[in-house]
């Protein structure tokens, strides 16, 4: 059954429509609307970087690009491959495209065993974490792009309208509510970043979270089953104090916050009050552009939106970046006329950690 879920069929003439570079190959039927040469080159470098970091030898790896008519891109990882869907007429910017491919690559190596709510935070959190920190360390991602991604993730985590959910509750909504869906990703990422800082602090910079992850990859490939308690044991072997309370705080309940030095001493952190993006309609509206579940007297209702009408609004990552006092502009078409409806972000706010490059002062 698992094999069937990982099976993809691509029908058509692929003789000209592929690119091979060492063990890597990229395949497409519809021209994907991106520079496949530079996409594949970046993929190759990132693949080498990751297989080296995770202590896993390189092997044949295939990327399949397919066309879809929607906004943005989505991707799913399978053994030795990933499939990425994108809209050739509205290609993603290079930065977002790279984040997605780096995230999918991590899935080739990093897994835990156990039920979904016990492992998804690690699988998706480590993919979000390493897709940012490894390219940063290798100079493939500059500090500004790294910080932008980390700070958006912090907002998605700590100002999420679903932030009060436990990881088990979030897992139950994983496929039906995109806000709950993001929680295991972002909580897992900030837990790993925080753990890396604790390990470095306690071992005078000798042990990193990479070392633990490499051990997991090695022992799982030798047939060992490693679940959440096995993970905690591995951390405790180095830190000599119970790990479950940290996991509970940062992942299971999400009540904790990562430490200031979670991403290294070159960054400093401050807590910023940011809007909780809750506009008085069902959160699916933000993805589908089709108003659902309008809350009477809620922000959208007060601004004049109607249930079940089609709207045009910024992509969710842009909405998450908005600050208190900003205004969300929504385009509505009614009877051939289009109007702009503005919703001021004056609702609930939450304190969220945001990092910036540390300014070195000389005295
Ligand atoms: Zn993923």
Predicted features along the sequence, with ranges:
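Surface-exposed patches in mature extracellular/periplasmic domains of secreted proteins
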Residues: 56-64, 115-119, 138-147, 205-212, ...
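Beta/coil-rich, acidic/histidine-enriched accessory regions frequently appended to metallopeptidases
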Residues: 219-363
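Long, well-ordered core segments of solenoidal/helical folds
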Residues: 105-106, 110, 150-162, 212-222, ...
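Pan-zinc metallopeptidase signature
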Residues: 165-253
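Propeptide (latency) domains of metzincin metalloproteases
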Residues: 1-17
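Soluble non-cytosolic domains of exported or imported proteins
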Residues: 33-45, 91-96, 100, 117-121, ...
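Acidic/His/Gly-enriched intrinsically disordered linker/tail segments
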Residues: 116-189, 202
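Juxtacatalytic substrate-recognition/specificity segment
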Residues: 15-119
């Amino acid at each position: 059954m698992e094999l069937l879920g990982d099976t993809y069929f691509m029908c058509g003439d692929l003789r000209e429509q592929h690119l091979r570079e060492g063990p890597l190959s990229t395949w497409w039927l519809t021209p994907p609307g991106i520079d496949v040469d530079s996409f594949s080159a970046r993929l190759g470098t990132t693949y080498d970087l990751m297989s080296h970091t995770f202590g896993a030898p390189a092997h044949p790896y295939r990327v399949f690009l397919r066309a879809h008519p929607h906004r943005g891109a989505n991707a799913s990882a399978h053994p030795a491959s990933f499939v990425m869907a994108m809209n050739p007429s509205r290609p993603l910017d290079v930065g977002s495209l790279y984040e997605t491919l780096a995230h999918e690559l991590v899935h080739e190596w990093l897994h835990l065993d156990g039920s979904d709510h016990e492992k998804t935070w690690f699988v998706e959190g480590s993919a979000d974490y390493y897709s940012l920190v490894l390219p940063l360390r290798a100079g493939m991602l500059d500090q500004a792009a790294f910080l932008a991604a980390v700070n958006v993730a912090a907002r998605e985590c700590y100002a999420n309208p679903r932030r009060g959910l436990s990881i088990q509750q979030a897992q139950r909504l994983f496929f039906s509510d995109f806000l709950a869906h993001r929680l295991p990703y972002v909580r897992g990422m900030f837990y790993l970043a925080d753990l890396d800082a604790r390990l470095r602090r306690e071992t005078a910079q000798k042990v990193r979270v990479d070392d633990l992850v490499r051990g997991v990859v090695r022992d799982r490939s030798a047939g060992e089953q490693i679940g959440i308690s096995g993970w905690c044991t591995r951390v405790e072997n180095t830190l000599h104090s119970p790990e479950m309370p940290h996991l509970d705080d940062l992942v299971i309940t999400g009540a904790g916050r990562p430490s200031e030095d979670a991403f290294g001493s070159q960054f400093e952190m401050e807590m910023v009050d940011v809007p909780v993006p809750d506009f008085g309609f069902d959160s699916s509206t933000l993805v589908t552009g089709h108003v659902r579940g309008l809350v009477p007297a809620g922000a959208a209702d007060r601004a004049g939106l109607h249930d079940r009408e089609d709207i045009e609004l910024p992509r969710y990552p842009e909405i998450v970046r908005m600050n208190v006092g900003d205004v969300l502009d929504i385009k509505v078409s009614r009877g051939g006329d289009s109007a702009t409806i503005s919703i001021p972000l004056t609702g609930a706010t939450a304190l969220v950690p945001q990092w910036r490059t540390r300014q070195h002062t000389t005295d």
